[in-house]
Amino acid sequence: MAGLQLMTPASSPMGPFFGLPWQQEAIHDNIYTPRKYQVELLEAALDHNTIVCLNSGSGKTFIAVLLSKELSYQIRGDFSKNAKRTVFLVNSEKQVSQQVSAVRTHTDLKVGEYSDLQKTQCWAKEKWYQEFETRQVLVMTCHIFLNVLKSGNVSLSNINLLVFDECHLAIQDHPYREIMKICESCQPCPRILGLTASILNGKCDPRDLEEKIQKLEKILRSNAETATDLVVLDRYASQPCEIVLDCGPYVDRSGLFQRLLNELDEALNFLIDCNISTHSKERDSTIISKQILSDCRAVLLVLGPWCADKVAGMMVRELQKYIKHEQEELHRKFLLFTDTILRKIHALCEEHFSPASLDMKFVTPKVIKLLEILRKYKPYERQQFESVEWYNNRNQDNYVSWSDSEDDDDDEDEEIEEKEKTETSFPSPFTNILCGIIFVERRYTAVVLNRLIKEAGKQDPELAYISSNFITGHGIGKNQPRNKQMEVEFRKQEEVLRKFRAHETNLLIATSIVEEGVDIPKCNLVVRFDLPSEYRSYVQSKGRARAPISNYIMLADSDKIKTFEEDLKTYKAIEKILRNKCSKSIDCGNTESEPVVDDDEIFPPYVLRQDDGSPRVTINTAIGHINRYCARLPSDPFTHLAPKCKTREMSDGPYRSTLYLPINSPLRAPIVGPPMNCARLAERAVALICCKKLHEIGELDDHLMPVGKETVKYEEELDLHDEEETSVPGRPGSTKRRQCYPKAIPECLRNSYPKPGQPCYLYVIGMVLTTPLPDELNFRRRKLYPPEDTTRCFGILTAKPIPQIPHFPVYTRSGEVTISIELKKSGFTLNLEQLELITRLHQYIFSHILRLEKPALEFKPTVADCAYCVLPLNVVNDSGTLDIDFKFVEDIEKSEARTGIPNTQYSAESPFIFKLEDYQDAVIIPRYRNFDQPHRFYVADVYTDLTPLSKFPSPEYETFAEYYKTKYNLDLTNLNQPLLDVDHTSSRLNLLTPRHLNQKGKALPLSSAEKRKAKWESLQNKQILVPELCAIHPVPASLWRKAVCLPSILYRLHCLLTAEELRAQTAIDAGVGVKSLPEDFRYPNLDFGWKRSIDSKTFISSQSSSAVESEGDCRLNTTMVPDSATSSAANHVIYTQTNDQMSVNCTPLCQKSLSDLRGVCFSEDYKAINGVSCNGVTSDSEAESGVCFQKDERIACTQEIPEKSTSFHIQNLPKENQPILNECTLSKKFLDGNVSKPTSDECPSTCTSDMQYESGLSNGYSSKTLGPNPGLILQALTLSNASDGFNLERLEMLGDSFLKHAITTYLFCTYPDAHEGRLSYMRSKKVSNCNLYRLGKKKGSPSRMVVSIFDPPVNWLPPGYIVNQDKSSDKWESNETSGEGVMANGKIDEDFDDDDEEDEDLMWRNPKEETDFDDDFLEYDQEHIKFIDSMLMGSGAFVKKIPLSSFAPPDQNYEWRAPKKPLLESAQFPSEFDDFDYSSWDAMCYLDPSKAVEEDDFVVGFWNPSEENCGTDVGKQSISYDLHTEQCIADKSIADCVEALLGCYLTSCGERAAQLFLCSLGLKVLPQVRRSVTSTNSISASSSYQKTSTRDICTLNSELSSCKGVEYGYLKIPPRCMFEHPDAEKTLDHLISGFENFEKKINYPFKNKAYLLQAFTHASYHYNTITDCYQRLEFLGDAILDYLITKHLYEDPRQHSPGVLTDLRSALVNNTIFASLAVKYDYHKYFKAISPELFHVIDDFVQFQLEKNEMQGMDSELRRSEEDEEKEEDIEVPKAMGDIFESLAGAIYMDSGMSLETVWRVYYPMMHPLIEKFSANVPRSPVRELLEMEPETAKFSPAERTYDGKVRVTVEVVGKGKFKGVGRSYRIAKSAAARRALRSLKANQSQVPNS
C-alpha cells in the first residue's frame, strides 16, 4: 500500500503555507462570489416556470412567499378590472394553514384558506367570484381547485401564479396532473412554481431519476432547478480528490478475533432466544443487554480485538450504573449476565496482549490504512513556524500533554467524565496543517477509534502531531429524557467542536451528525471509515472537504468493494444529473483551477501609473477585486453582498456579460462588458471595466483596494486638530485625563477696585426672606429673622458696572432668602480717606467676622484680580434712601470689642448694669475664655425669670453664680441680672442650598421631633450665659446674619456673571441672543426647580427603621450633625445624592382652594412663590399672600416651552413711592393678623408686576431673542460634583441627542453619496468626547465651569485677596480618593453648627461633663485634637471615606507654575480625581488658626503621612494646583459641559439657535453662506490659551469674535432620491404596489413615494434598481428618533432625574423596542429583502411577538418559553426590523421637508404606550440590574462558541450558582444569562422571609 499518493497540503507544489485551510478568506478570485442558492432559485422562478428541488421545508416557504411578493403588483387591485390572483395548492388539508400563516406573516396580502372539499363543493359561482374578489392569495387543497376549474367558476387566465407544493406527486395520477392538463388549453398560462423535497429518497437509479425529472418537467411545463444543498454544498469550491481504498481482509493469526466473535454471537443468540413475554406496557428486559453486546460486536468487526477490549472496559463501567439503579430482579439478571460476558472478553484479551500498549496485530486493516493516511499529513519540520527547537526538544511521551488523553485505568467512564488536561492556550504547532474528519457509523466506534489514534500517537512519532477528538450526536440513551448527564454530554460536544474550529484539535472523529448543519471549518481530509450508504450521506460528507486542496477518501473492506463501486457510480451519475439542473448550468467546477493563461494581450490591464511597480488590475485579477469590494460594503450578519453577473451569447457568436453591483454601492448602473469569444473571458472583462469605474469614482483607492470608511474622501469633515502637545497622561477626552485650568473671573469684576476721585458704582445686596423655615424644621423653635426687617444691609462698591443677573436664593437659618443686586447710584466719587476706611472694613468683614483669612491668603486689593469692596449701607439722613453708612464704619473702627475682648472691670462700687435694649440685636463674646479666638454668640432670648442665683441645671453646682466662681473664680457684681439664651454665630458659610434637603430637593430624613423638642426645652441643652461676663460686639446680630451670607452671595454672583458673560460672548460668536440686555429687562430668578416637600406628610418616617412614636405632632426622622462645634472639619454641606438638575418646568400649583392653601404654604409647591417680594410688605404676610396671585390659581411662568421656571420673575424695580400692587394685599383673614409694617421705600425689594403668561419675561422680551437665562447657563456649567442644587446632567443628555441629530442631518444632506459606514464614521469622529473636549477648551469653557463644592474656608478667594506663595499650606497631592464626603457614621458631613443640636452619637464629651454646657468648647477642642491625632496616627477614625494610603508625599521635582503669578498656594491632585470636592479634606490639610485650640496652640500645616503609608503608584503623575484660583477637570467633563450648553441653548432659544451655537464652536452643522473676513488668529488663540493667564482669556475671546464674518444658511434636502432610469416611474409603481395600505396605517401619505420604497429596501434586494437601500435613511432616522424621544422625556412634567432619564432613554431607544414596534405596526409585511436567513429570523420573531402579544422591555423577556431551562436562548431580534423602523422616520423627515413635528406626529402614537409604561416603571438592562444587585459576586465568562455557531456566556454569581445564556452575539447571550440569573435570584429572595 506504499503506493498511496496523496496530495496533502504539505506536499502541494504551492508550498506549505498555501493550504492552511482556515487562513484563507473565502474570497474567490476566478469566479464571482456565489450567492445563496435560495436567491438564485428565486431568480430562476421569476424568470421562467420552475420546479425547485430542495432538501429542506423552510427553503421552500422562503421561495414561494418571496415569489408571490415579487409578483404581487399583478394581484393588487380589483378582480373585475383585470387584476389577477395567486393560488397555492397543497396536497392535504393540514398543510393549508401552514402556508396561510407564512403568507400572512410576511406580506400584507389578503389570504383565503379553503380546506373543506364538502363545504366548498356546494358553493355557487357567485360565492367563488366573491372569494376571488376579496382575496388576493388563495391557499387550497388541489381537489378543491380542480373542482373550481372544472365547474368553470374561475378561469386560469385570471391567475398569475400557481404554486404546487409536493409537485412530484404529479407524476402519478393526481389532481395536480389534471390541473396541468387544463393549463395546457389555456392561454396565457399562469407562472408555475413546483416545490419538492423528495425527488431523492434513499437509493435510486440514476436512469430512473433522470426520467422522473424529465417527466415532471414535461408535466409541469417547467425547468427543474436543484438547490446546491443536494449537490456539493458550495458548487464553486474545488472538488475534492475522491479515492476509494481497498483495505484487504483481516488475518486473524492468533484466533482471538474468532473467539471473541463466537462469545458475543452466542450471548446475543441466547438473549434473542429468551422470549420473555413482554406486555406492551413493560420494557423489554433484554433491550439494554442486546444493545451493549451488539455495539461491542460491531467494534470488534470494524476495529479489531484491541478496541473491543477497550470498549468492553467502558461498557462494564456504564453497566455498573444501570445495575446499581435497577429495581427489578429480572432486569438485573440480564444486566449481570451482560457484565459477565464483557468481563470474559476482557480476560480473553489480556491473555494475548497488554492493554497498555497498542499492538498492530490486533487492529483491522482499515485502521492500519487510516493511520497510514494520517502519517502522510505529518507536517514538515520547516513548517513548524518559529518553534522548531521546541518541537525537537519534546520527548514523545510528554508530548500529548496538550491533548485530551486520559489514562487507561481511569475508572470513570470517560464519555461522561472526560478529564481533560489543561491545554496551552496557543494552538499546538502540530495542528498547523491537517484539518480532517473521519466519519464512522456508530457512536462507540468513534469513541474507541479516538482512543486508538491517541495511543498510536504515543507510540509512533510520525503520528505525534495529531490532536484528535470525537463527537457523536446526541444519541445517548434515546429512551431516557434529556437529563443533567446529557446536558454535560452536550456541553462536551460543543467544547469539542469549539476546539476543532479553533484548530486546537486537527482531527475529528464523527458520526453522521456532522454531515449536516453543523458549523465546522473547511477540511482538507475527509475519510469515510464506514462507507456512505446513500447518496445524501455521500454528498454531505464529501461537501465537508472544502479546502482548496482536499482529499475525500473512502475505506472499503475487500468484500464490500465491488458493491460499493456500483453505488459510487450511481452517486456520481445522480450528482451529474442534479448538477445539470443546478440553476447556474455552466459547469464552473473546472474554472477555478484552470491554468492561468496570459490574457493580458486579449484585454489590457488597468494600470494607475506607467511604471513597473504600479498597482494594476489585470483581466485575471479583476473578479477578485470586485468580490473584495462587495464584501466591504455595509451589510448585516445575514446578508453577504455579492455581485450579480449575467452572461449571454450574442446572435453572432461572441459572449457579453453585464455586471450588477449590490444596491448600496455608489456605482449603480449595470456595467456592460465588451463582446469576448468565451463566457469566462466575458465575465472577467466586465469586472476589469468595473474596477476602472470604481477607481474613477473613488471607491477603490490608489492601491486599487476598497476604500475603508476611515480613509474618508471627505477630509474637511474631520477637521484635524493639531494634536495638543501635552505631558498629561490619559487618552484625550476621557475621564482618566485631567488638567488644570484657572478659574474664570468675570470681566466686569476684574480690576474693579475703586480709585479715589474716579466715578464708582454702588450696588445694594437686597435680601428678602421669601420662604420662612417651616415649623417642622425649626427644631430649636428659634425666632426667624427676616433680613428685610432691618434697614442696614450690605452693598458692593465697584469701578465697573455689573450686568443684570437673575435674583437667586440663599438658605439661612430663617429660611430661603432671595438675593437681588440692584444699582443704587453711579457716577459718584470717593476720596482716598473714605476709600481706605471702606477697604479696612471690607477686610474686617472677611478676616474677623467670617474668619476667612489664613496665612495663605493676603489682602492686597490693588494687586488682586477681583477687588470690589463690600460695605454696610443704611438709610442715612432724612431722604429715606440707602447710602454708605460711614458713621457705622467709624464706630466699628473705634470699638474695643472689634477684634479682641475688651477688659471692662466691674466692682461692687460700679456694678454691672443690665440694659435690655443693648442685648436685643446683639452678638456677645464671653470674656473669660478662648482669649485669642473668642467665640461669638447671637442673643436668642433674654430670660428675665432667671438670675445668676437660679438653680443650676446639673447637680454639681447649686447656682449659676457658684458655677462661675468654682470654675473660673469669677465674682458677679449684679445678682439680679437676667440670663441670656444664646446661639452660636454661624460657621456654615455655604448657604447655596438648604440644609434639610438633599440635592434632589428631597427632604433628608430627620430624627424624631419628640426627642428634639424635649431636648431644646430642657435647660440642660441650652447655652446660657451671664450678661455681665460677656462683651457686646459692635456689629449687631441682624447685620452679622447678613454677613454670614456674603460668601455664598458673592460666589453665586460671580458664577452668574461668568454665565452672563458666556451668554454675551455667544451672542457675538453665534449671533444667538443679544450682546447686552435691555435696561428694563430682568431674567426670572435662579431656582432649583424643586417642589419643596416640607409638608409633614412627607416626613413621617422616611426611613422605615424609625418607628413612629405614639404621641406628639409630626415625626421628623433624620440625623443632623450638631452645631455646637465650629470645627473647620465641618464647614461643608455635603449632600447625600449628587446628581441633580435645575428643573426647567413649571409645576402648576395644585388646584386647591385658598383655605386649603393656608398653612400649607410649604407643601409640595411652596417653591412656586419663591421669588415674590413685595415692596413694603413683610415677609411673613407676603410669603403667604403670594400664593394666590394668579386668577386661575396656576402659577404661570414659562419661559419658552422647555424652560419653565418655577419661581416668579422679579421684574424691574418699581419707581419710588409706587403704590403696592393690590394683589399683594389680601384679606386680613389670610394675613393671619400679621399686619404688614411698611419698610422704607427704597429698601431693595422689588414687586411682581403682571406676569406675561407665555414668555414669562417682562416687557415682551423672551429668552428666544435674548439668549438663555444665565441661571440655566450656570446649570450647564455645574458638574454634579459641585453638589449644588442643580447640575448639567439633564441638559447634557438633551444636548447629546440634539448634537447627534444635528450632525447626522448635516452629514446626510451634505454627502448624498456616502454610504452609512462612512457617515457613521464621520459622525463618531465629530461627536466624540475627544473632539467636544477640544472645542470646549478652545472656547474657554473649562475656566468657567463649577467643578467642586463651594467651601469658603478652603477654596474660595474673597474679593481683594491674593494667594500668597510663602505661607501657602493648602498644597498637597493625592492619588485617588472618593470625594463623597460622607462621614464615618453615615451622617451627612455638614458643619458642626447651625440649626441643630448635637446628636447623641456625635458627642465626644463625657457624660459627667454634661453640665458643662457653658464650656462646651472644650469638648470641641478635644475632639479636634483627637481627630488630628488619629489622622496623624493614620487610623482615620473621623472621616472613614478617605483611604489613608492615598496621600503621596509632595513630589519635589514637579512644580506646576501658574501663569504670570508667583508660585501659588497650591494643592496637588491626581489625574484621576473626579472634580473632587475638597471639603472633606479640609480638616486634614489645614487647620485654620482661628480655630486653633487654647491649650495646644498648634496648626497642622500640610499633612504628610509616613512613607510606608502611601500606597500610591510611583508612575502616577499628580497635579499640583491652587484650590483658590485653579480647578482640575477631567477632559470628559468638559465635553459634557459643551453638550449641556448646547442643551441650554436648545431649550431656551430653539433648534436653529442650537445649530448656530454648534457652528460657532467649530462643529459644522449648517452650510456656510459667505465669509467676509477669515479668522486668522483662531489657531494662535487656541494654542496660546494654555499659556495665558486668566486675565487675558476673555480679552482674547472678544478679539476673536469680532472677526467672525461667517453666515450660515439652511440645509438642503439631497436632490435626488431616485436614480436615472429609463422607466423609473413604472418600476416604482410596481415596487410599491400595496404600500398605500401602510401609509393609511401610519397615517402619513408620502409626497415622494421613492422615499417610502427606499425606507423598506434592504441591501440584499437587488430588484430595486431605482433607489438606494435603507441604510442611509436608517442612519438619519436613528438620530431623529433618539432626539425626539429624549426631548419628549426631558420635557415630561414628571421631571425625571438624570439617572431615570438615562435609563428611560436606553429602554426606549434600542433595537429591541424598535423591532417590536415595527412588527406591531406591520412594517415587516412591506419589507423588501432577499435573504433566506433574515427571512427566518423575522419569521421567528414575528411568531414570537404574536404569541407574546405584549410589548418588550429593555430586551425584556425576549426569550422562548421555559421548557428548556437548561439552555436559555434569547429569541433573536432581527436588527433589520429596528432599522426600517428608523429608516421610515428618516424617510418621513426628508419627505416632509425636514419637519421633526411631522415625524413625531407619526411616531408618537406608536411610542406613547411604551413611554407611559416605562416612565411608570423604569426598565433596566438585565446585565446592569444583575451587576447592581450583585456588584461583587457576578462574573461573566468570556464567550464560548456552541456547536451550531452561536455564542454562549456563563455568569457565575458566587455562592448562588452559574447561569448560561445563548445567542447569536456575545451581547445577546450575555443578557440571556443575566436574565436567567436574575430570575433565579429573585425566586430565591421571595422564598426567604424578610429577615
UniProtKB/Swiss-Prot annotation:
Cysteines paired by S-S bonds: none
Residues covered by the Helicase C-terminal domain: 425-594
Cellular localisation: Cytoplasm
Main location: cytoplasm
GO molecular function, one term: ATP binding
Annotated RNase III domain residues: 1248-1379, 1635-1793
EC class: hydrolase
Keywords recorded for this protein, A-Z: ATP-binding, Cytoplasm, Endonuclease, Helicase, Hydrolase, Magnesium, Manganese, Metal-binding, Nuclease, Nucleotide-binding, Phosphoprotein, Repeat, RNA-binding, RNA-mediated gene silencing
Cofactor note: Binds 2 magnesium or manganese ions per subunit.
Gene Ontology CC entries for this record: cytoplasm; nucleus; RISC-loading complex
Site (Important for activity): residue numbering on this chain: 1775
Motif (DECH box): 165-168
Protein EC: 3.1.26.3
Signal sequence annotation: none
Binding-site positions, ATP: 54-61
GO biological process, one term: pre-miRNA processing
Domain spans labelled PAZ: 887-1034
Cofactor section: Mg(2+); Mn(2+)
Residues in DRBM domain copies: 1818-1883
Superkingdom of the source species: Eukaryota
Pfam families: DEAD (PF00270), Dicer_dimer (PF03368), Dicer_dsRBD (PF20932), Dicer_PBD (PF20930), Dicer_platform (PF20931), Helicase_C (PF00271), PAZ (PF02170), Ribonuclease_3 (PF00636)
UniProt-listed PANTHER family: DICER-RELATED, ENDORIBONUCLEASE DICER
Family: Belongs to the helicase family. Dicer subfamily.
Record's function text: Double-stranded RNA (dsRNA) endoribonuclease playing a central role in short dsRNA-mediated post-transcriptional gene silencing. Cleaves naturally occurring long dsRNAs and short hairpin pre-microRNAs (miRNA) into fragments of 21 to 23 nucleotides with 3' overhang of two nucleotides, producing respectively short interfering RNAs (siRNA) and mature microRNAs. SiRNAs and miRNAs serve as guide to direct the RNA-induced silencing complex (RISC) to complementary RNAs to degrade them or prevent their translation.
Protein name, UniProt field: Endoribonuclease Dicer-L
Originating species: Xenopus laevis
Organism placement in taxonomy: Eukaryota, Metazoa, Chordata, Craniata, Vertebrata
Protein's gene: dicer1.L
